Structures are given as C-alpha cells and as structure tokens.
Amino acid sequence: MSEQAPQTRWAQLTGGVGGSDYAARFEALAATGQDVHGEAAFCAALVPAPARVLDAGCGTGRVAIRLHDLGYDCVGVEVDESMLSVAVATETASSRPDWVLADLSTLDLDQHGIPGGFDVCVAAGNVIPLLAEGTLVRTVAALTATLRPGGLLVTGFGLDSAHLPGTCPVTSLAAYDSVCEVAGLELLVRHGTWQGTAFVEDQGYAVSVHRRSRS
C-alpha cells in the first residue's frame, strides 16, 4: 500500500470544502470587470497553441479551462475534491480539459494514463506555499518530470503575509530557486505580476519561469 500524502496547507485552511467559495470569489471579481485570466494569458504568451499545458493545483479549473478555450491541450491536477468538482461542473461542451485527482507531491501521470512531455507546467494561486509541509522538494521534482526537455515550469506565489492566505508560511525565493536547481531547472525570468510587470524585491509577489534542462 502506498504511503498517504500529508495534508496540504490549503486543506488545513479550508477543511477540503472551499471549492464553491473560491469559485464565487472569482465570479464576483469577473462581474466587476476585472481580468481573471492573467495566468492563462501569461502562459499563452510563452508558448503558442496547441502546446500541452499541465495546470498543477488547478483548483476550480479557471486557468485550464481558459487555456483549453484558447486551443491548448490541457490537463488539470488537483487534490481537493471540492475544487475539482467545481472544475468538472464548469467545463463547457467546447472546453473539456482532462482532470486528475492527485497530490502534486506524489504525482505520477502514468498511473492516470496521461503521457508526460508537457511544454508548460503552471502552478498559480499560491500552490507552492500551500503545499504540505516538507513536500516542496519532491513536488518540484514531480512537476519537472512532467515536462519535456526545455519545458517551462511557471509559478506565482506571495512572499509575505499580505499576499498569502491565513497563517500560510512564506516560501522564500532563495529556497524555491535552490530546489528548482536541484531538480534540473534554470531560472529564465521573474516578474512581479501575471501581467509581466518588473519584479521588485519587497513588493510581496513573484511570477517565476524556470526551464527544464534540454539534456
């Protein structure tokens, strides 16, 4: 029997029942005219459709569904059943990404009949700091393994309490970059927002693009 993955910090904050509330928050933002597709637009600017994109920690499917609508071949992975159920209910007839219920720290797409070799793996929405304690190294290794040589790992997460939910601890960029280097990733570029603004050390948020070694 395989070892059970530890509880993510997201699950500790929400009790695993936060899907509907999370979706409602973005629906409210969209209703005010705010752009809620910055992450998808960022990824689309990196690689043209029909590239393969893995949405790691896809939540309610907002990013994966948007990219699928833009012509990308998308797979969404989420461990929170309440979030993934919203994703499945939200998809339209023309937008049906493949959904996988799995923990990122133990992710093995072969077990779900999905081949690797993704062009992009995106982990938005504070996925990295909301991982279970002590799982950053193996999660980054697992995500790197889903990429083709030269594929991109794209992450966006808060760097201080103002940009993180609840009592979620900070994952420093130094720690994250070190783990990425060990996994065979090199930093290509870092921005301060999903809109591509310049990164400033004390602004509290970073969007990072790392590339898997081509060897």
PLM regions: where:
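Class I SAM-dependent methyltransferase SAM/SAH-binding core
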Residues: 60-107
